[in-house]
A protein has these predicted regions:
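Proline-centered turn/helix-capping motifs that create local helix->coil transitions or kinks
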Residues: 1-4, 52, 100-104
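Non-heme Fe(II)/2-oxoglutarate
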Residues: 1-47
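Short, conserved, surface-exposed binding loops centered on an aromatic residue
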Residues: 33, 54-57, 66-67, 84-88
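Conserved short histidine dyad/triad with adjacent acidic residue
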Residues: 48, 66-84
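A short coil-to-beta-strand element that immediately follows conserved catalytic motifs
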Residues: 51-62, 106
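Amphipathic alpha-helical recognition patches that constitute DNA-binding helices
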Residues: 64, 93, 158
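Catalytic core of Fe(II)/2-oxoglutarate
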Residues: 71, 81-90, 99-227
Length: 227
């Protein structure tokens, strides 16, 4: 057991999280250190066939230990796509479930949805010692939208780790989305299920390549002159 440092309670997510490495029990720290090691990074590189070099995040931004109690949810979403402090793109999510004797009727299935958010392609029960590795990009919708129905005193627990690279394929980018934002989306047939991100005029412009070119020019030349 460990003390959780963050409590999320809103329409999109009801969960606890702790990303402070020093708060974890020693076995958890050692396990996370291994998953962030060069040995494991090489394994991931070969497994995923990602061309860009994968980089671990020892800061555990958004990762670490997660816990969801009875009634908790994590609505379908795409993750933030950039590291908050490093110039890196997010590429891979790893989830390790810690739920002994977890039953199907407890729910909490990880759902992987298609790019158009019209169909759930895969449901994964969060049973003990199960690891899920999946690509994270601007179209990789996932979550567990149905409230967990485990008994009182039980909870859905997991370790979450994220891996990054410098650059990513254009096919993984949705220019209408703001960098470093989590986007929650309603499932087909569920109206106002989430508090989604606003898509105003600026976001609309981001869908055009000329807008991206202008912004890159601004960053490269105009902002540099101001410094």
């Amino acid at each position: 057991k460990t003390k959780f440092s963050q409590n999320y309670e809103n329409k999109n997510e009801i969960k606890y999280a702790n990303s402070k490495h020093s708060n974890f029990p020693e076995p958890v720290r050692l396990f996370i250190d291994f998953l962030n090691s060069n040995t494991y990074l090489n394994f991931l590189q070969n497994l995923t066939s990602i061309q860009e070099e994968l980089v671990a995040d020892p800061q555990l931004n958004g990762g670490g230990l997660h816990e969801i109690k009875k009634g908790g949810v994590l609505k379908i979403h795409t993750d933030f796509n950039r590291h908050p402090t490093l110039n890196l793109d997010r590429r891979i999510n790893i989830l390790i479930y810690l739920n002994k004797n977890w039953k199907d009727q407890y729910g909490g299935h990880l759902e992987l949805w298609d790019k158009s958010m019209t169909k759930c392609r895969k449901k994964i029960l969060p049973i003990f010692n199960r690891m899920v590795i999946f690509s994270t990009n601007d179209f990789s919708y996932h979550g567990h939208p149905e409230p967990v129905s485990c008994p009182e005193g039980e909870s859905r627990k997991s370790i979450a780790l994220y891996y990054f690279s410098k650059g990513r394929p254009l096919s993984e980018i949705d220019y209408s989305k703001i960098k470093n934002k989590t986007y929650f989306e309603d499932r087909l047939g569920f109206k106002n299920e989430t508090d989604g991100q606003s898509k105003g005029p600026k976001n609309f412009l981001r869908s055009f390549k000329f807008y991206k070119s202008i912004k890159n020019f601004e960053k490269k030349y105009l902002r540099r002159k101001k410094k």
